[in-house]
A protein has these predicted regions:
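Charged helix-capping and loop-helix junction motifs
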Residues: 36-43
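Metal-dependent phosphoesterase/phosphodiesterase active-site architecture
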Residues: 1-22, 28-33, 46-55, 61-185
């Protein structure tokens, strides 16, 4: 992993690109309760922050989640961290308050577009191709970013396919608790 860190730092250091996107298999902030990814986070997240990465695309955990960074005044800003998958397998996740949006029980893919001072990340349900999440990262002339969270108006899909059992019951309770916290019907 140290070799990967060294390589990533070299690439980010020499990059003068307006938009920086990092792709990782394991997420820096896990959405699975049994995983913390602390080693990965301490290796790579300082680089994400130091070199002004705008978007971190991650996988491995077989669900969807988006987390945004926040500035000193609490305003949403880059980097945006997404965890996504397109596998038929789904995992139980934790509904950590740091995340802005979750999706369970379906598959998701992202479309990233850049137009001038705006990077748009749209996430789609791979089964229906319906828009599921949407974020615009907008940079001013100084390079400071702000976020427009267009996904907050799109209902979260918290689908759970139960075969019965204690694990399934516990996960359904976590879903219900999260929905209550967010005011989701």
């Amino acid at each position: 992993m140290r070799t990967q860190k060294k390589w990533l730092e070299e690439q980010l250091k020499k990059s003068n690109a307006q938009w920086k996107i990092v792709v990782l298999h394991h997420p820096l902030y896990s959405i699975k309760g049994s995983m913390n990814n602390l080693f990965q986070r301490t290796m790579f997240n300082p680089l994400v922050e130091e070199y002004g990465v705008d978007l971190v695309l991650q996988g491995h955990e077989h669900a969807y989640a988006r987390m945004t960074a926040h500035g000193e005044n609490g305003e949403a800003q880059a980097p945006v961290y997404t965890v996504s998958h397109c596998s038929p397998k789904n995992y139980y996740i934790e509904f950590d308050k740091r995340f802005d949006k979750f999706g369970t029980g379906s598959r998701y893919y992202q479309q990233i577009r850049v137009h001038g001072d705006t990077l748009t990340m749209n996430a789609y349900d791979a089964t229906t191709n319906d828009l599921y999440d949407a974020v615009d990262i907008i940079k001013d002339k100084t390079g400071k970013s702000r976020l427009e969270d267009r996904g907050k108006e799109i209902p979260e899909a918290l689908i759970f396919h139960s075969n019965g059992g204690k694990k399934e019951e516990a996960f359904q309770k976590r879903i219900d608790k999260y929905k209550q916290r967010k005011g989701i019907q």
